[in-house]
Every structure is written in structure tokens, then in C-alpha cells.
Amino acid sequence: MGFRGEALASMTYVAHVTITTITQGQLHGYRVSYRDGVMEHQPKACAAVKGTQIMIENLFYNMIARRKTLQNSPDDYSKIVDLLSRFAVHHSNVSFSCRKHGAARADVHSMAASSRLDSIRSVYGVSVARNLIKIEVSDNDPSSSIFSMDGFISNSNYVAKKTTMVLFINGKWFQIIFHIIILLSMFF
């Protein structure tokens, strides 16, 4: 997935971070917690599901001004949910879950799926997934292939209140609106 370690290290300074991990073949996993950039204890053996779970709690607990802006801005949380939804679709082999503190139900929940369409179904719903057409394009020369693309587009029957485009190029998220504005500003 290309998760950058320094970003995770930075999170340990502004949130309570707990990492639980187990690899295939191990009898038990290990859990470690961080606070204020410091490991609270040595990794402890624990029961775990195969893979790595990163739990971030009490975000900005030690930065009162930033925490207050989060508490007063549902917009920040909706941006987090939107971003996690996009990554859940692109990285269909990884499970994602995000919920507000105290909420009974997750706002984003995807299981490591067998296909991208399964991830779309779990994140955006059955009606969206049912109205998608798979597209695959390549330069048709496997020996020297320099271009290939796959994805989904909605069919002409689908009507939505809001347009959602999820675009990753070479595994990197591409923020379409931001880049279109930059391109347009170069010419106009």
C-alpha cells in the first residue's frame, strides 16, 4: 500500500496509537501502544487476526486548539470518510473501518475483498455496484507494455446526487479537481 512510516510515527505524537499484527503461521500476534511519540511498553503477545491493525484514538488529545476545530467541524470528519472510502476501493485487499467515537455503526467498512467491485459494493452500496461497467485498456503488447488501465464507469441508467471519481495512477491517489484547476490556470 505504500504507507509511509514517518506519517505513522508523526501520528504517535498527536494521538493514542495501538498497532496489532500477526503474520501467517504465527501462533499469536503482538500489540504495542504509543503515546507522545513513545512506546508505552514492549510488544505484548495477544490474539490477533492475520494482518496488521492500526488503531488511532483521541486524535489531537494534546493539541487543544486543533481538537476544538475538529469537534466543531463535521466537514473534517466527512473528508476523512471520503478519503478512506477511496483508499478502500483502490486497495481491495485491505480491510478498512472508520467510525466516530461512540457511534454504533461504522461510516466506512470494507473487508479485504476478492475484487474491486466487491469493495465498491461494500463502500458505496449495491445500487452503485449494480450500475457499473468494467473497462480494461492496454497497448496490447505484453512484451513491451507501457500502458494499461482498468476500472469502472457508471452506465447511463445510474443517477446520483453527487459525482464521485476515484482515480489512482501508478498506485498514487490523484486528486482530480485540484489538478484540473492547476491545468486550467496554466491556460486561462
Q: Across the structure, where does each feature detected by a protein language model lie?
A:
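N-terminal phosphate-binding caps/lids of nucleotide- and nucleic-acid-binding domains
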Residues: 1-188
